């Protein structure tokens, strides 16, 4: 259940109504209904699909574990300690919240759909639409949050006097969610359940978007709009931001005498920018195959839909795209952040023996107040 925009199918010869286009977010697509059905073979029973099912299951389990636990730790620590609430962490919190919701709400249903029931939806229309909508919103929030972080870094390093304040950041965060929620509305509006005959006398209930056949042009226009606004545009903008930042940090001479503190700050900023560029690269590598596959499938369907294992390949490509949330969580929450230290202190405070009384809480807050929320040596203090 990845990006919901690219899954569409035009074939009125099966169970879906003949005046509709089936757009199946749970990985059914433009030419799915055009594939000749073999009465003797169910694609879900092939060895290729079995192998893909294992890969998908492992990936979904990883997302639930890494994104569920990691982002919960980050959110809990951020809620408990005000010192963690700098501009950068507030922007990262958008990623954490969206990925956490997907990990605990969407992934269990996806595990049931892909792995347990092997492409059959058994949870009703409301959950079908809700899960797909939440998954789509999460993708757009993640993309827009990464873009906001890149802009924040650009302003902080290239134009430090113009850096965002908390009021501007709050407006930007609200805009990130508002845009994501609005753009994803079609994924909920057009989502329904569809019964398909996979092999003779065998049916599966698919959860997906059903676009009227006379709205094919609208669907394609909508997909291209989202592709430009939520992939091409952000990637180009982030690339330009980090290119300009790199020029500032690596190729611009620093005037005056460089103290050890200045050199340390410069090294820290360089490492941070390298981390952010790595995250951008991972985002492109994870999502470019999915968008590319979707474009070929929706605009040049004859190139792929006759391939026997085309659907299985699409599931794997989508699985790779979904796994990007794990990379974000590992990089932002567990690798280069002080969040784990604060979370451990919070647990220590909670489980501390009662005879220490209220003093333990005061002592803990006093001690943590001297620990930077984002350490220079860890290269995540970005001011």
Swiss-Prot record:
Intrachain S-S bonds: 128-207
Name the record gives this protein: Prokineticin receptor 2
Subcellular locations according to the entry: Cell membrane
InterPro entries cross-referenced by the UniProt entry: GPCR_Rhodpsn (IPR000276), GPCR_Rhodpsn_7TM (IPR017452), NPY_rcpt (IPR000611)
TM regions (residue ranges): 55-75, 90-110, 137-157, 171-191, 223-243, 273-293, 313-333
Topological domains annotated Cytoplasmic: 76-89, 158-170, 244-272, 334-383
GO molecular function: G protein-coupled receptor activity; neuropeptide Y receptor activity
GO biological process, one term: G protein-coupled receptor signaling pathway
Chief location bin: membrane
Record-stated family: Belongs to the G-protein coupled receptor 1 family.
């Amino acid at each position: 259940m990845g990006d919901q925009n690219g899954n569409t199918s035009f074939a009125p010869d099966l169970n879906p109504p003949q005046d509709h286009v089936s757009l199946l977010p749970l990985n059914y697509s433009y030419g799915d209904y055009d594939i000749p059905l073999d009465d003797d073979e169910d694609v879900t029973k092939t060895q290729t699909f079995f192998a893909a099912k294992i890969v998908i299951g492992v990936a979904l389990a990883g997302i639930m574990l890494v994104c569920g636990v990691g982002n919960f730790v980050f959110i809990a620590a951020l809620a408990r300690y005000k010192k963690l609430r700098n501009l950068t962490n507030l922007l990262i919190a958008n990623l954490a919240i969206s990925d956490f919701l997907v990990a605990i709400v969407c992934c269990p249903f996806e595990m049931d759909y892909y792995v347990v029931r092997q492409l059959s939806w058994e949870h009703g229309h409301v959950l079908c639409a809700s899960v797909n909508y939440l998954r789509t919103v999460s993708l757009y929030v993640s993309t827009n949050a990464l873009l906001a972080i890149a802009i924040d870094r650009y302003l902080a390093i290239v134009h430090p006097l113009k850096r965002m304040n908390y009021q501007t950041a709050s407006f930007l965060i609200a805009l990130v969610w508002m845009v994501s929620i609005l753009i994803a509305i079609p994924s909920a509006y057009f989502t329904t359940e569809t019964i398909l005959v996979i092999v003779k006398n065998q049916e599966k209930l698919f959860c997906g978007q059903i676009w009227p056949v006379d709205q094919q042009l609208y669907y394609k226009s909508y997909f291209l709009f989202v592709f430009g606004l939520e992939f091409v545009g952000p990637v180009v903008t982030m690339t330009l931001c980090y290119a300009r930042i790199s020029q500032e940090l690596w190729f611009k001479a620093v005037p005056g005498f460089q103290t050890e503190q200045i050199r340390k700050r410069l090294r820290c900023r360089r490492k941070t920018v390298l981390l952010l560029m790595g995250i951008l690269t991972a985002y492109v590598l994870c999502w470019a195959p999915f968008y590319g596959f979707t474009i070929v499938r929706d605009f040049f369907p004859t190139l792929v839909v006759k391939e026997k294992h085309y659907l299985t390949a699409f599931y794997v490509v989508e699985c790779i795209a979904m796994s990007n949330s794990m990379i974000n969580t590992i990089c932002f929450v567990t690798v280069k952040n002080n969040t784990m230290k604060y979370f451990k202190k919070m647990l220590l405070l909670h489980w501390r023996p009662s005879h220490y009384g209220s003093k333990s809480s005061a002592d803990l807050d006093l001690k943590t107040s001297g620990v930077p929320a984002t350490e220079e040596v860890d290269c995540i203090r970005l001011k």
